[in-house]
From Swiss-Prot:
Pfam families: Ribosomal_L21p. This protein binds to 23S rRNA in the presence of protein L20. One of its GO terms (biological process) is translation. This is Large ribosomal subunit protein bL21. Part of the 50S ribosomal subunit. Contacts protein L20. One of its GO terms (molecular function) is structural constituent of ribosome. The gene is rplU. NCBIfam families: L21.
Length: 106
């Protein structure tokens, strides 16, 4: 069984047992978190699809928090001897999907 969930403004296709990185969540490592905004559920019988499936949820365990690799930004003005360098490291939360519960379409 798989599901499409929404967190941090992004959509993720997940299955039980998978580990993935999502935008930073304010939950301590080792705690459980429940995602209620599920857009799609799928299994061998077919799919359930909708804006938000009523009663559907995905539970996950927070494995760790961290920061992604550095992205380097360079702004350059030609012929003006001007260059600006900047770096950014995005915070993320690594989660492990522990369960997917089905629901009815809203």
């Amino acid at each position: 069984m798989y599901a499409v969930l929404v967190t941090g403004g992004k959509q993720y296709r997940v299955a039980q047992g998978e580990t993935l990185r999502v935008e930073k969540l304010e939950v301590e490592a080792g705690n459980e978190i429940k995602f209620d905004t599920i857009l799609m559920l799928g299994d061998s019988d077919g799919i359930k699809l909708g804006d938000a499936l009523k009663g559907a949820s995905v539970t996950a365990k927070v494995v760790a928090h961290g920061r992604a690799d550095k992205v380097r930004i360079i702004k350059f003005r030609r012929r003006k001897h001007h260059m600006k360098r900047q770096g950014h490291r995005q915070y993320y939360t690594e989660i492990e999907i522990t369960g997917i519960a089905g629901g009815d379409k809203k």
